[in-house]
Design a protein with these regions (language model features):
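Active-site groove signature of glycoside hydrolases
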Residues: 71-73, 113-116, 199-227
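Extracellular/periplasmic catalytic domains that process cell-envelope and extracellular macromolecules
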Residues: 62-63, 102-104, 166-167, 210-215, ...
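Short catalytic-loop micro-motif centered on adjacent basic/acidic residues
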Residues: 172-176
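Alpha-helical scaffolding within the catalytic cores
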Residues: 93-97, 153-161, 196-211
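Extracellular and organelle-lumenal recognition/adhesion modules and their flexible linkers in secreted
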Residues: 1-154, 171, 181, 187
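Catalytic-domain carbohydrate-binding cleft regions of carbohydrate-active enzymes
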Residues: 154-155, 161, 168, 178-197, ...
Length: 227
């Protein structure tokens, strides 16, 4: 519910599926009542292993409060997960217009992870494909309950954050998690960002397409760590 869509704007829909038998799925963007269908497409899911499917949706009308609907008619055992909807022109999973607005603000230093999220985030989850990063329950559910039913998600990883900082011209400021992550895991994060390709985690960064160290100079220990 409550998805703002723009007329003629292509969106990328994705989800993972496993089924006992072939099932035709229908994906649509509609009004809140489901009476107006702005766009609709179908695909066939088949197989007992998780398989990712992506389709493009282009609504023929704008709606600030649209619904995303996934349906199927055939009876059977169906599992779905990792549902996502992004503008086709997204920047590393972020809305392009928001990134442009951040440029205009002239942000000089950008901190991440921020707030209570910093006390839950595990940077190593970001090494997995986004569909394989487990959600985690927020210890301050009051903040996230209205939006994500009390859960946070690791949809942005270290490489995405550095790309954002470079795009908007900001100095990256990374907050490590000394509460749940070990000193060794946090040291590995520093090495991933700043080590050259001769170090284990610098080599991993290079293997992921980023040969030169990120040279992150600003680091902090947790968020409100005294509480």
């Amino acid at each position: 519910h409550g998805i703002a869509i723009s007329q003629g704007q292509p969106y990328l829909f994705g989800m993972v599926v496993k089924t006992q038998n072939p099932v035709e799925f229908a994906v649509s963007l509609t009004d809140r009542a489901g009476k107006k269908v702005y766009c609709r497409t179908t695909f066939t899911g088949e197989g007992a292993d998780w398989t990712r499917f992506e389709v493009e949706l282009t609504p023929q009308a704008a709606d600030p409060d649209a619904d995303l609907r996934v349906s199927w008619e055939k009876e059977g055992h169906v599992c779905v997960g990792a549902i996502s909807l992004l503008p086709k022109d997204h920047f590393h999973g972020m809305r392009r217009d928001v990134v442009e607005a951040m440029k205009e603000l002239g942000i000089k230093v950008l901190r991440w992870p921020g707030g209570n999220f910093a006390g839950e985030f595990n940077w190593m989850d970001g090494l997995l494909p986004v569909d394989m990063r487990a959600p985690f329950q927020s210890y301050l559910g009051l903040e996230t309950q209205p939006h994500t039913m009390g859960y946070d998600y690791s949809e942005i990883n270290t490489d995405d954050f550095i790309a954002l900082c470079r795009e908007i011209g900001a100095e990256p400021f990374i907050t490590i998690n000394p509460c749940w992550n070990t000193p060794e895991e946090n040291a590995a994060w520093v090495e991933y960002c700043n080590g050259d390709a001769s170090t284990p985690y610098g080599k991993l960064r290079a293997q992921r397409g980023h040969q030169e160290p990120y040279n992150v100079q600003l680091w902090s220990l947790g968020n409100e760590f005294g509480y």
